[in-house]
From Swiss-Prot:
Multidomain protein; including a starter unit:ACP transacylase (SAT) that selects the starter unit; a ketosynthase (KS) that catalyzes repeated decarboxylative condensation to elongate the polyketide backbone; a malonyl-CoA:ACP transacylase (MAT) that selects and transfers the extender unit malonyl-CoA; a product template (PT) domain that controls the immediate cyclization regioselectivity of the reactive polyketide backbone; and an acyl-carrier protein (ACP) that serves as the tether of the growing and completed polyketide via its phosphopantetheinyl arm. Binds 1 phosphopantetheine covalently. GO terms for biological process: fatty acid biosynthetic process; secondary metabolite biosynthetic process. This is Desertorin synthase. The lineage of its organism: Eukaryota, Fungi, Dikarya, Ascomycota, Pezizomycotina. It comes from Aspergillus desertorum. Pathway: Secondary metabolite biosynthesis.
Length: 1733
């Protein structure tokens, strides 16, 4: 006979070493069952940990295997040490048993006749897994359920211990068990009976183990155990030793019953639970030695758990039973040797086989195999050409759109960089591509980046952040919500294959963020850093298959357990012409347009942008987490076409083998695949090879079911590194929409090289094909992706598992819906989006799921709102009201940090039947708590509280009402704490002070119930009920005294607030007093209480109650307590005297005075949120009237509302106050009935951060070029370093310290210069626009600045004080040069440079214009203008409103330039930037889009500046104002006072120019300021101040603008001033406008003109602090107005790198020296200012 013994101790001392050896052996080929056991137990423990309270769950480390926890987690010292000992001891013994039976092949057969099982403690529980398993193969599943039972048993013991003697999670562990030797059981029991007589029953010490030698183990709360051994007597002197038993009380029949067992075995799977035993081996009870009675596995588990919880271990009984059963040869099997085993060996005279010996066996490793792990896609997002989200992507597919286009201006100049012949160096032969609109749009503030850093960061990195966030949001990701979302186990893997932005954009002017902003590794790294993911982070480059390869790596990472969640995708944004050139010259690209996939005329692919992100999890984890599963990746693989004719050529046999490999891994027949999403580039070689491989595998002959093929590249082009993820997202959308969209790649005819697809039943959808789920056949999609580098990647996608639709509602009847954002604008937009969604989907939206999604499955931000309702219509109504509140006048404020919470425990007050009925019936955590407390009541000998709660007892006794009130308060306290609402301070009134003391940790739940119950019994015995009562009065104490006759005595029992007093007295007196008060207009309410608490009515019980209170264990406060008795604050670590409760029973409750004292001590502040915990809010008004301006006061229960309604309102208020509610914990009981909704994505606050690629330097690289023929030529400046289209040669160059003089000459007839003039014609002649001068002056000024200060980058410059004297008109005869001379000189280049322009003839030099260039600060300008931007915007809006009213005109682009041509000037297309204009008199606004330009060759392109500025000329020359004559007069440029652009003008960007011209001081002259607004940035970025136009008779136009070649231009004009100004400018302006006048558009409120830059010099006007702020604003790109004392520097992009830069700048520019960590040590603007002051 076999005796199988399972011990209650580990077989070795070093637990970690044991589990390491088990792990090593599990890798052996012999131990497949062991591996399965570990996997099953891991899943079971994961599920149980998911159900733990957050405060415990978050203390556990992430783990992939249960062995990780057993080995690496120091569980022996954790608060749940006992719980984990249950788990790991059972696990160890089961692993040892299974491993032995695998390593030593033997019969797994245990019958009643040949085997018997027994065990001690937790080993007894482990034995049930073997007894309940018919075969060895059945053990893993059974063991997993037993492990869950063990964990739950440990938790039951832990919670019971907390009820008896609560311990904080960080407190040192204390032993609950002591071994006592020599005395024997009877003697110990006598001593315990004597000692326990003064101890409440649940807290009494008891015997848990009786050893055969007479030693006993005694158990009990550690503090009571210490008291026991400090009491003189035999136990004090007996030999004893505390044991490492920390979990709580076990083997305690007085503490546990069958209800605990039912919860422990609740989740046993039915297929295991109902296994029947017929001839199974018996399991002997460790209590009486008798076999457990069980017919099924469930009954066996229940019996074993009951014995474990309630039975005293008597090992002698087991030995005696075994001795009686001895029959023949006996062999003992056990895990290691121990004292019980040795006793077995002696009694049975039997040998022992050690089940640990196999751990030393040599390991035969398992051959590498593919891990059978299905991967779920749970979130996705994209930015694609023509589609900035998933919805638009599907619309694009459904509509069959082909979105290819010419390369847009924001990438590069397609005309100069394209040459279809390929003869020009480095040009592309195709102008086509597919592009994302505005790829620079980004919410920098959300991701804690400064505008400066955002601009320097590759847009693929930024869009990766945006799409990763959106995919995570769709997945319902909350950091650390579940084991699979623990941040330490999340990986990021992205495919990338180019560096366009780094090479063509950011590289033009390298800044501090060049490296982290552009190198590929930083894209996934930045995502990991922002979200604080600590898992692997990879950037993958396999060329065109990079993103699908990244997904494959992600799947492998998940399968191997290296991560629990992966964010993966692909990135591609095209900005460099080099790749276009290289690919087109290698014949990859189509010269005729998009990808013509499957077309007979396919001539190559069309390049495309693309950014896509996916969130991946193991399928089991996704289902456990209640995620939405979009699709399931069954298998993925990659191979390489090494047998191809060249590295870039596809190879059909290799692709074919790849498909077969993937299908083998997935276990799916190729004939079951319905759709192949092909790579499909539209190249002849690629399409033919791919169709060959696809048909050979999926349709080698005609198949019965249709096979559809398609390729997304026909719609979107080839996204290269993003191609694979784009195709995968398309496949997922197909599952989502149950339709296969039409293929649009065939433009002429099907590729003639294809086989007969119809014969093979292979179809290319010409229209959208419905494809709905089928009940008996799953849908599969093969996604194929190959690479120009030879790689092939494919994956098989299965449709998502079907889930039942949730019912109409879960148990809750009212729900909270939340909306939040990082800024007010996004909050408003998020709110609008949610409302639009609800209106659109109102009938099908499940209210519970909506609440669950917006609360438990959303990351929450400081700007937030919460509404509650009982229906979707309710929610919409409340959202509409909140949206109305979010006006500009009342923006929603942000709460920076969670508020302190104060718990207020009210007294007995208004008891009513059915208290907390809804929670008790439908919220299991609360019900479980109430039942535990009810069990404590019964164990103390008090009546049950359940009848009073379930409405079955209408008139409960005073004892029951008091017990019920306190138990409900304790349960509600635990409920709030489970939701992460924990108190910073506690106050209790009257009876509520008992629950308050429990909340502070001063009383255990058991002691609290004991004291309340004993007090209630004393009242029943010693106080006559209903002879006295209490009266609540709304008056002051003095007012009450003034209304009560002297003959009527009363006592003031409670001072709740200044005007809320409760008095006590005899019932007759109180009745009379009530009548007296009411007759004088005071409100008085008699309380429904049988006794007059806090009065002399309590005197009879005080002495006895004080004696009883000594029996409770006094503990130090863990939370500050506000004492209404002492009118004081008792801080942590204070221990209350035992007499406190008796004194509180009799003493006056001075609630308001105590609150005021706490307020004065700042323990309560204006930010404190009060949570009243009681059966009805009786003290909320007292709190409000005592502490003014508090954040919120919320109730927990109300007698006039159902529980859901009250809690919803309170949780909404707490949420808006920024309390950190654990919504996941709240919804956990309901989660199976709820679904994660696909709600609208976050509304970003997008601004365009984009460095425009300028010029054509990518074409000529290190070679000079002649734009006409591409040949090299030498610059006319003879290598002196400056050559632009308008500056040709240096004729004089002199420099000295700080200054210099340079003279340059330019040939007006040179082709580029002449082209500038030709775009601006007057009277049919080219005329050099005066806005050519800014480019010439600023280019030369920058050159001079660089020469004088070669180590300093040129700053922003203001070209002002400009006076135009004559026009510059090219000669008709261009056979000889026509020279214009520019002179610039300065004595201090850092301040001002004088500029003059001259026409140079053979015998004369004529002055054309003069001006100055002043050095400025762009950031200061932006700050300056931000203060007036709203005024400009208001005028623009007023003009636009006039259009709608029909009182102003909106002119189209064609109309504007038609009027210009008829009035004064004919502009070429390059100058025609105005897209539309609104004009009203002398006021106008124009929308301007600048033409493309090679920006690296210009400083201020004339056609850009002219486009921005000529709205002022249009107003005067072509406008409709009545106060000037534009019929007989034309207006030409006289000059301007200042021209400043804080940011470069960008081709393709939308600007808005606003001007109002007014008469100037000189008669006929008009002046105005042109404000330039960047529409995308919504800010003023440029200003032409004091622009002045002078009148010229129209009749003289031909004289001045069509002269002979030797004539002057308007030099003899009668309107010309007689005296020319000198070169040195004056500080004032000669063309300041007069006072503003009225307008039909409303009063004009334009700010005063900005002063001259020399007057507003930043250095001379600002203090050091304001200089410092300006520097911070400049370096981060933040507006000065956005910097306030609360601004967090890290959130505007001041990281460690920028911190060092600012420290250096402070030292250089301010003379202030700080350490490198200064901005990290002082992280807000306010702190920086204080340090500087």
């Amino acid at each position: 006979m076999k005796v199988l013994f399972f011990s209650n101790k580990f077989p070795v001392e070093e637990h970690a070493d044991l589990f390491q050896r088990i792990r090593q052996q599990s890798r052996s080929s012999r131990h497949a069952v062991l591996r399965q056991l570990l996997d099953e137990c891991t899943a079971a423990v994961r599920e149980e940990i998911r159900l733990l309270p957050a405060e415990i769950r978050t203390r556990l480390p992430p783990f992939q295997s249960i062995l990780d926890l057993a080995e690496g987690f120091r569980w022996e010292r954790s608060p749940l040490a006992g719980t984990f000992e249950c788990v790991f001891l059972c696990l160890a013994e089961l692993c040892l048993f299974v491993g032995d039976y695998e390593a030593r092949p033997q019969a797994f057969k245990f019958t009643r006749s040949d085997s018997v099982f027994t065990g001690l403690g937790l080993g007894f529980l482990a034995a049930t897994a073997i007894v309940a398993s018919p075969t060895l193969i059945d053990v893993p599943a059974t063991a997993a359920d037993v492990i869950r039972i063990a964990m739950r048993a440990g938790l039951v013991v832990y919670h019971q211990g907390q009820n008896l003697e609560p311990q904080s999670l960080s407190a040192p562990l204390q032993s609950w068990t002591t071994l006592v030797k020599r005395l024997g059981e009877e003697a110990v029991q006598r001593e315990l009976d004597c000692f326990n007589s003064a101890i409440p029953r649940p807290s009494q010490i008891y015997i848990s183990v009786v050893e055969p030698d007479g030693s006993v183990f005694i158990n009990g709360p550690p503090s009571i155990m210490r008291l026991l051994f400090s009491t003189p007597g035999p136990l004090q002197s007996a030999p004893r030793a505390p044991l490492p038993v920390y979990g709580g009380p076990c083997h305690a029949a007085h503490l546990y019953d069958r209800s605990h067992v039912s919860w422990i075995v609740k989740h046993v799977r039915s297929e295991i639970a109902w296994r029947e035993f017929s001839d199974a081996a018996p399991l002997l009870s460790m209590a009486d030695g008798q076999p457990l009675r069980a017919q099924t596995a469930l009954e066996l588990f229940e019996s074993a758990a009951y014995v474990l919880l309630t039975g005293i271990i008597r090992w002698g009984n087991v030995l005696a039973a075994l001795e009686e059963r001895e029959d023949g040869a006996i062999q003992i099997e056990s895990c290691g040797h121990s004292t019980p085993v040795e006793k077995l060996m002696r009694v049975l005279h039997a040998p022992t086989r050690d089940l640990t010996e196999w751990l030393s066996d040599e390991i035969e490793a398992v051959p590498g195999t593919h891990a059978d792990c299905r991967i779920a896609v749970v979130g996705m997002s994209c930015r694609l050409p023509g589609a900035d989200d998933l919805e638009h992507f599907w619309e694009l597919l459904e509509q069959g759109r082909d979105v290819h286009q010419h390369v847009p201006p924001d990438r590069y100049d397609v005309q100069s960089h394209t040459d279809p012949t390929g003869r020009r160096m480095n040009t592309s032969q195709t102008p086509f591509g597919c592009f994302i609109d505005s790829p620079g749009l980004f919410d920098a503030g959300f991701f804690d980046m400064s505008p400066r850093e955002a601009g320097q960061t590759d847009p693929t990195h930024r869009l990766a952040l945006l799409t990763a966030y959106e995919a995570l949001q769709q997945s319902g990701y909350i950091p650390d919500r579940t084991l699979s979302t623990i941040r330490e186990t999340v990986a990021t893997i992205y495919g990338q294959c180019s560096d366009d932005y780094r090479e063509a954009n950011a590289g033009q002017e390298i800044d501090m963020y060049f490296i982290p902003g552009n190198y590929r590794a930083f894209a996934p790294g930045r995502i990991s850093y922002f979200f604080k993911f600590s898992g692997p982070s990879f950037s993958c480059d396999t060329a065109c298959s990079a993103s699908l390869a990244a997904v494959q790596i992600a799947c492998a990472t998940l399968s191997r357990g290296e991560a629990n969640m992966v964010v993966a995708g692909g990135l591609n944004i095209l900005t460099s012409s080099d790749s276009f050139a290289g690919l087109s010259r290698a014949h990859f690209l189509s010269k005729t347009g998009g990808c013509k996939v499957f077309d007979d005329g396919a001539d190559g692919y069309c390049r495309a942008d693309g950014v896509g992100s996916l969130v991946l999890k193991r399928l089991a984890d996704a289902q456990r987490d209640n995620d939405n599963i979009l699709g399931v990746i069954l298998a993925a693989a990659t191979n390489h076409s090494s047998a191809a004719v060249s590295i870039t050529h596809p190879h059909a046999p290799t692709q074919e083998e790849l498909y077969r490999n993937v299908l083998r891994q997935a276990g799916v027949s190729p004939l079951d695949v319905d759709l192949v999403e092909m790579h499909g580039t539209g190249t002849q070689a690629g399409d033919a090879a791919e169709i060959e491989s696809v048909t050979r595998v999926f349709s080698p002959s005609r198949r019965s079911e249709r096979l559809y093929i398609g390729s997304v590249k026909a719609n979107l082009g080839h996204g290269e590194a993003a191609a694979g993820v784009t195709a995968l997202i398309k496949a997922l959308l197909i599952f989502q929409h149950n339709a296969i969209p039409k293929h649009v790649g065939i433009k002429t005819a099907l590729n003639s090289r294809f086989p007969d697809l119809g014969q093979l039943n292979v179809h290319i959808p010409g229209e959208t094909v419905p494809w709905s789920p089928r009940p008996n056949r799953k849908r599969y999609v093969m996604v194929n992706n190959f690479s120009a580098a030879g790689g092939n990647t494919a994956l098989l996608l299965e449709e998502p598992p079907q889930r039942p639709t949730p019912g109409p509602a879960c148990a809750q009847t009212r729900f909270v819906v939340t909306v939040s954002a990082k800024n007010p604008l996004s909050l408003r937009r998020n709110l609008e989006r949610l409302m639009a969604f609800l209106r659109q989907h109102q009938p099908p939206v499940h209210l519970g799921s909506l609440a669950y999604t917006t609360t438990a499955r959303r990351i929450h931000y400081p700007h937030r709102i919460a509404v509650q309702g009982a229906s979707i219509a309710d929610i919409i109504k409340h959202l509409e009201l909140r949206l109305a509140d979010l006006s500009l006048a009342h923006p929603q404020g942000a709460v920076a940090r969670p508020p302190p919470i104060a718990f207020v425990f009210s007294g007995q007050g208004s008891f009513y039947p059915g208290i907390s009925h809804d929670l008790l019936e439908h919220y299991p955590p609360y019900a479980r708590e109430i039942h535990q407390l009810d069990a404590l009541c019964l164990r103390h000998g008090f009546p049950s509280i359940l009848p009073a709660l379930t409405s079955s007892e209408n008139s409960p006794s005073p004892l029951v009402t008091q017990l019920t009130t306190v138990c409900v308060q304790i349960a509600l306290t635990h409920l709030w704490k489970s939701l992460a609402i924990t108190p910073a301070v506690v106050i209790g009134a009257s009876l509520g002070e008992y629950a308050a003391l429990h909340a502070t940790g001063a009383l255990s739940a058991s002691d609290t119930i004991f004291l309340v119950g004993q007090r209630g019994l004393l009242m029943q015995d010693l106080c006559t009920a209903n002879t006295h009562t209490m009266l609540a009065v709304q008056a002051t104490a003095n007012e009450i005294a003034g209304c009560v006759p002297d003959s009527l005595s009363y006592e003031v029992a409670c001072i709740n607030s200044h005007r809320s007093i409760t008095i006590a007295g005899t019932r007759s007196n109180i009745t009379a007093i009530k009548a007296s008060l009411e007759s004088r207009g005071y409100r008085a309410t008699e309380l429904n209480v049988p006794y007059a608490f806090h009065s002399s009515h309590m005197d009879p019980i005080l002495e006895k109650f004080n004696a009883i209170a000594q029996q409770a264990t006094a503990r130090a406060l863990k939370v500050p307590l506000i004492s209404p008795l002492l009118v004081d604050v008792l801080h942590e670590h204070t221990t209350l005297p035992a007499s406190y409760l008796a004194e509180a029973t009799r003493g006056r409750v001075r609630f308001s005075e105590a609150l005021e004292k706490a307020h004065q001590a700042t323990l309560i502040t204006d930010q404190t949120v009060f949570v009243e915990i009681g059966i009805h809010p009786t003290y909320s008004n007292a709190v409000r009237s005592t502490v003014h301006n508090i954040a919120a006061v919320v109730p927990t229960l109300r007698s006039d509302q159902d529980n859901w309604h009250t809690l919803a309102g309170s949780m909404a208020a707490l949420y808006e106050a920024a309390a950190g509610l654990d919504w996941n914990a709240w919804f956990e009981p309901f989660e199976p009935e709820l679904r994660l909704l696909d709600l609208p994505r976050y509304a970003w606050n997008l601004k365009n951060h984009w460095i425009q690629h300028n010029g054509d330097w990518l074409l000529w690289k290190d070679k000079d070029r002649d734009r006409d023929n591409g040949k090299c030529m030498t610059h006319p400046d003879d290598g002196r370093g400056l050559y632009t289209p308008l500056l040709h040669r240096i004729v004089e160059e002199t420099f000295w310290a700080g200054g210099g003089r340079v003279v340059m000459e330019s040939n007006v007839h040179q082709e580029e210069f002449f082209a500038v003039a030709s775009g601006h014609k007057m009277c049919g002649r080219p005329v050099v626009s005066v806005f050519s001068y800014p480019d010439m002056a600023l280019s030369l000024a920058r050159f001079v600045y660089t020469k004088v200060h070669p180590d300093i980058s040129p700053p922003a410059m203001d070209f002002g004080n400009v006076h135009i004297f004559e026009g510059l008109i090219p000669h008709k005869d261009r056979s000889s040069p026509q020279w214009v001379r520019l002179q610039i000189k300065t004595t201090s280049v850092k301040h001002q440079l004088q500029v003059s322009f001259h026409r140079v003839g053979e015998d004369r030099v004529d002055q054309l214009a003069t001006g100055t260039v002043s050095v400025g600060n762009a950031a200061s300008w932006l700050s300056e203008w931000s203060g007036i931007a709203h005024l400009v915007s208001s005028r623009i809006k007023a003009l636009q409103d006039l259009v709608h009213e029909g009182r102003a005109d909106r002119l189209t682009r064609d109309t504007v330039y038609h009027l210009f041509r008829n009035s004064i000037v004919d502009y070429s297309p390059a100058y025609r930037g105005i897209q539309s204009a609104v004009i009203d008199g002398l006021e106008a606004v124009a929308d301007v889009v600048l033409a493309s330009s090679n920006m690296d060759r210009w400083t201020a392109p004339p056609h850009h500046v002219d486009s921005i500025a000529h709205v002022c000329g249009f107003v005067l020359n072509a406008g409709n104002a009545a106060d000037h004559d534009n019929i007989n007069t034309v207006y030409v440029m006289e000059g301007w006072r200042s021209m400043r652009f804080a940011k470069p003008l960008v081709s393709g960007r939308l600007y808005r120019s606003y001007v109002r011209m007014v008469p100037a001081r000189d008669t006929g002259f008009f002046s105005g300021d042109v404000y330039v607004l960047d529409v995308a940035e919504d800010e003023v970025t440029g200003l032409l101040a004091g622009v002045t136009l002078r009148p010229l008779p129209r009749i003289l136009m031909h004289r001045f603008f069509d002269p002979a070649d030797d004539a002057h231009n308007w030099g003899n004009s009668p309107a010309k001033p007689e005296a020319k100004p000198e070169m040195v400018p004056t500080s004032g302006s000669s063309s300041a406008a007069g006072s503003p006048s009225g307008s039909s558009a409303g009063p004009l409120s334009i700010p005063e003109r900005l002063a001259d830059p020399s007057e507003t010099s930043f250095q001379s006007k600002a203090s050091k602090v304001s200089k410092a702020l300006a520097l911070i604003a400049s370096e981060t790109g933040i507006d000065m107005q956005d910097l306030n004392d609360e601004t967090c520097l890290a959130q505007i992009g001041v990281d460690s790198l920028l911190s060092l830069v600012l420290v250096e700048k402070f030292a250089l520019e301010l003379g202030v020296h700080f350490p490198g960590s200064f901005f990290l040590d002082f992280p807000t603007v306010g702190e920086v200012k204080r340090q500087m002051l």
